[in-house]
From Swiss-Prot:
This is Uncharacterized protein H171R. Keywords: Late protein, Virion. One of its GO terms (cellular component) is virion component. Residues 68-112, 153-175 are annotated as: Disordered. The keyword RNA-binding does not apply. It is found in: Virion. It comes from the Viruses. The keyword Cytoplasm does not apply. Residues 94-105 have a biased composition (Low complexity).
Length: 175
């Protein structure tokens, strides 16, 4: 914690105060924010803050002020140079300069990698497609076997005179 680093540079009593603040920070934090909001809005109603919490708020204010004083950037135009100047890269005499990639000799205009990847990809697609079609054909064979096992006896052919109307006689209304 930044506050802890500040207190280490102060006295032993300050470290004890910080330990107390850390121990009670969760319970204190919400009320301290509420206290600051009301103080900034200049509301004069009495607040439910114990004297101990008031001391803690004063300590935290003091510590934050000290931290801001110590870590304030100097005023003025922004720095244009980095803190640590960059050293120019010097190539030693032992190192060889990097050579550009040279294409292996071949009849094709395309680089070797592109040709390899195209061939490899087309072979992979072909094998995947053939596996897929083999699977579909196998499923078709299974369906034929299942159809033959579940084949139902054919229904006896009905005469043309055997209508569904005769099964369910309905009186026709005549007007």
């Amino acid at each position: 914690m930044v506050v802890y680093d500040l207190l280490v540079s102060l006295s032993k009593e300050s470290i004890d105060v910080l330990r107390f603040v850390e121990a009670n920070l969760a319970a204190f934090n919400q009320q301290y924010i509420f206290f600051n909001i009301q103080r900034k809005n200049s509301i004069t109603t009495p607040l439910l803050i114990t004297p101990q919490q008031e001391k803690i708020s004063q300590i935290v204010d003091f510590l934050m002020d000290e931290y801001n004083k110590n870590n304030r950037r100097p005023s003025g135009p922004p720095r244009e140079q980095p803190m640590h100047p960059l050293l120019p890269y010097q190539q030693s005499s032992d190192e060889q300069p990097m050579m550009p990639y040279q294409q292996p000799p071949g009849d094709d205009d395309q680089p070797y990698e592109q040709i390899y990847h195209k061939k490899h990809a087309s072979q992979q697609v072909n094998t995947e497609l053939s596996d897929y079609y083999q699977h579909i054909l196998a499923l078709g064979d299974e369906d034929k076997v299942m159809d033959s096992m579940l084949k139902l006896p054919e229904k006896a052919k009905r005469d043309d005179s055997d209508d569904e109307d005769s099964m369910f006689p309905i009186k026709k209304l005549t007007t």
